[in-house]
């Protein structure tokens, strides 16, 4: 059983540690910084400028003790683009993909760039491909905090990928 677990984990870990990266498109309708996005907001704003996106969507967190949303200054209105800060339901990558699908239908977006932490790229791509209903380019966050990867994180992302193989879109 242990050998089977190791054999299954090695390819998953490689996908987590060295995900397939896509070039950033010249233009997109929306940039979605999935959560928690606090550390890579500078990169999200840069992507907004580079792609000419009209809307920035950001997943924000919830205080587990109070259920209150953690609103941040990056949720303040921008003179350059529309800002939507939200808590997806469910509060998972799967929920973020379904949220993007629903927002894309409501706002008539035809494509999106999704920004996430490096270990999360592969799992994000699985959910976005399955649920978003529009072409999505997944971009790896490059800030220092996003670069920290540990064994626990690899195991968590790998487990999330496995769960993603059996769950459907909300």
What are these regions (language model features)?
Residues 1-13:
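Hydrophobic membrane-insertion alpha-helices, especially the h-region
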Residues 16-155:
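A structural signal for short, hydrophobic/glycine-enriched beta-strand patches
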Residues 147-170:
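A transmembrane-helix-recognition feature enriched in membrane-embedded lipid enzymes
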């Amino acid at each position: 059983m242990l050998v089977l677990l190791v054999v299954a984990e090695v390819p998953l870990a490689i996908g987590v540690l060295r995900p397939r990266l896509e070039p950033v498109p010249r233009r997109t309708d929306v940039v979605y910084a999935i959560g928690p996005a606090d550390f890579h907001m500078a990169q999200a704003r840069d992507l907004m400028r580079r792609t000419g996106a009209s809307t920035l969507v950001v997943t924000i967190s919830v205080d587990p003790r109070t259920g209150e949303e953690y609103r941040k200054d990056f949720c303040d209105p921008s003179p350059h683009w529309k800002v939507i800060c939200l808590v997806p339901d469910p509060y998972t990558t799967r929920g973020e993909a379904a949220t993007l699908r629903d927002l894309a239908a409501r706002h008539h977006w035809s494509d999106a760039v999704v920004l996430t932490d490096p270990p999360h790229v592969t799992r994000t791509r699985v959910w976005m491909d399955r649920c978003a209903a529009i072409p999505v380019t997944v971009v790896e966050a490059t800030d220092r905090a996003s670069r920290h990867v540990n064994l626990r994180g690899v195991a968590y992302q790998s487990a999330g990928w496995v769960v993603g193989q059996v769950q459907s879109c909300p």
